[in-house]
């Protein structure tokens, strides 16, 4: 059997890809933990979330720069285009809020990093359940692709993403 790919364009020379690992087991490299300086990062999922937080910050800067460029262009039609640029981020936030609604968690939209509010408390992604972390890793990985073509390789060791 095997795997086959159909490329578009046909003369493409590379595939942009990302890997999602959803194992929630403890990190073994204590040297790595010391380097990042975040005591909340304890598992492989936490590590993925940590890396995705950095990519999310870059994503926000990039879309912010594109919005500024459009708004300062002097072209009236670019105002509508500028508003459209932030739609994927808003869709992501709405989707996460909907998926986590049973637990009362909502994304703090005014925060630069991913944080949640639940019953007046502020939560980091590291405080989420394993299934919530897995879902957040998947959705964040898709968001930070910034509408660019990408192949995602993903394992699924647990049933929790189905719930």
Predicted feature locations:
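Phosphate-coordinating catalytic segments in nucleotide- and nucleic-acid-processing enzymes
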Residues: 1-123
């Amino acid at each position: 059997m095997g795997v086959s790919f159909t490329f578009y364009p046909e003369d493409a020379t590379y595939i942009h890809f990302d890997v999602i690992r959803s194992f929630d087991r403890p990190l073994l490299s204590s040297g790595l933990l010391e380097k990042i300086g975040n005591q909340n990062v304890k598992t492989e999922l936490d590590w993925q979330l940590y890396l995705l937080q950095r990519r999310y910050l870059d994503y926000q800067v990039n879309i912010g720069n594109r919005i500024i460029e459009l708004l300062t262009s002097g072209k009236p039609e670019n105002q509508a285009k500028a508003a459209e640029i932030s739609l994927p981020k808003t869709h992501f936030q709405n989707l996460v809020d909907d998926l986590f609604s049973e637990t009362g968690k909502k994304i703090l939209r005014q925060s630069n990093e991913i944080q949640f509010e639940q019953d007046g408390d502020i939560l980091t992604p590291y405080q989420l359940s394993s299934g919530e972390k897995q879902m957040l890793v998947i959705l964040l990985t898709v968001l930070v692709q910034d509408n660019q073509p990408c192949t995602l390789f993903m394992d699924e060791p647990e049933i929790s993403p189905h719930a």
